């Protein structure tokens, strides 16, 4: 009965997901790019850990229900205490209007997460309390299970990652256009080759626009035909050479490959 209740609740707000009050600027970039319009990606969260009595940004994530956040498995350490910052634009402003800080109840890391091969890089965070949705805090939509996007489909990566290779973490949320690179292309030898699996999705690779350190766990935002935004990917890895290497697009965990796993964890 509990599972039915949770799933029914999920369907109730899913109909209004992925619809920001403040519309995003759809021509911005991440690396070497521009600030996002404040609160135009209201499902974007900052995952923060406590060290020396200070909360520090470590990864991004996506609010998918008022109680749950999607992020990357590689963002999670059993030795750290976490909180989730919601409704944020500027991480340097602690009491930013419209923002909220929530503790963590449970973290579900995928049972088959492989840190060496970077497989199944997905985790679901259950928040310690239910978040009240607002103009600055909204949920993203989940894509249809198994669905794929075509080559060059326009998507946007968002995060507070480094503005450029070895540069500083961004204070204000960044965004950038990263078109999808299909599996047939991304798995070619001079791209990512066999490193990329069908449970992943690639985007970018033009040598200019890229996710960077600190963006990990954050969403690949793709607009559906109905105008709402789906979280199609979770930032997983990129080139070790630099943040924006030609033919080395950002690699994301493909969310549509894990819908069944996500739904199972939502019921726990």
Swiss-Prot record:
Listed InterPro entries: Peptidase_S1_Elastase_sf, Peptidase_S1_PA, Peptidase_S1_PA_chymotrypsin, Peptidase_S1A, Trypsin_dom, TRYPSIN_HIS, TRYPSIN_SER
Protein's name in the database: Chymotrypsin-C
The protein's Enzyme Commission number: 3.4.21.2
Organism: Bos taurus (Bovine)
Known catalytic reactions: Preferential cleavage: Leu-|-Xaa, Tyr-|-Xaa, Phe-|-Xaa, Met-|-Xaa, Trp-|-Xaa, Gln-|-Xaa, Asn-|-Xaa
Intrachain disulfide bonds: 17-141, 59-75, 155-222, 186-202, 212-243
Annotated compartments: Secreted, Extracellular space
GO biological process: proteolysis
Domain annotation Peptidase S1: ranges: 30-268
Database matches in CDD domains: Tryp_SPc
Subunit: Monomer. The zymogen is secreted as a ternary complex composed of procarboxypeptidase A, chymotrypsinogen C and proproteinase E.
Propeptide intervals in chain numbering: 17-29
Lineage summary: Eukaryota, Metazoa, Chordata, Craniata, Vertebrata
